[in-house]
């Protein structure tokens, strides 16, 4: 990243791990390299935070319509169960007005936002844990997701059949939650006898068996582990090793009609139903129409509908936060870009998201906060006012840090 031409150097990384045309991911000046000289690196691996949110829901709740809107993709959204057979993956940009401001300051040719990946997973019905419907395929696909977005129907439409014959959000949520709980119970019930033998043979630590038994007890009470594990005192790190579906964070999307979108009492009721998880209310059909418009027209349509932001933008933001992610920024004439890191990441770990060499040979990071940069208008002015700082290997990145990494390999 070159925040000021002449201050921070630019470089181009080419053909890294099969990725071609990857332009100037960041500026990086090797220790000892003359000022004004760019440094080119040989092939090595890129590191990235690639997390996905699985979109699940009973058939005909508007799940594929939502996915179509999220990705502007063409996904079959027919009015019959199992219209979605294979999981469809979409990468959705995370709205970030800071990038537009950086592009203005540095005359960037383009902006590259952070992204959230969504996977549209085939519909689930009662008995999925026993293989009913597309149960086995559903369970295999959802295990690969890092968080679960459960789409629930909260609108009435006689032309769109409901798989259970009635619209009842609490019932839909219970159906899907029950299938996930049952599937996780099966996983643990198979694992516990094996773990008991391994503990007796001193091949496995007792805490692993104890964690499995405690988790099974929570599930037997009909509670998702994401909601009940902490209260039960279950070791979170050990629990992760079982790769259970109900340990994943949940987001609940209620697909509503015009009446529902203006019914605050109904929304409060549904929000309480899924608390402490996040609840998002949107009209999937409206969102699908919105994404087909030019930005100015879309903004006007949102305003006329009494909304400050689209449901999709909110879903992307909530999804990003639910995954425990944040961004730092780079900027220059070629591009202004947001990079995705986990909350709590150190400066070397953040550098590794751009290129593994940056982490391996990390020396320091030159950082200015976005707010300070905008206030002073340039890196040079921010530096003159003492707002640009050098940080070392132990620095924990803050959201909105604008960064230049220095490294030596």
Segments (PLM) and residue ranges:
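Conserved G1/Walker A P-loop phosphate-binding module
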Residues: 44-132, 136-142, 148-152
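Ala/Thr-enriched low-complexity intrinsically disordered regions
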Residues: 5, 20, 26-33, 38
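Conserved Switch II/interswitch segment of TRAFAC-class P-loop GTPases
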Residues: 123-129, 146-182, 202, 224-228, ...
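Short, positively charged and aromatic/hydrophobic N-terminal segments
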Residues: 11, 39, 45-46
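Conserved beta-strand/loop subsegment of P-loop NTPase cores
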Residues: 117, 146-153, 172-180, 186-193, ...
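C-terminal-of-GTPase-core extension/linker across diverse P-loop GTPases
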Residues: 44-56, 61, 67, 194-398, ...
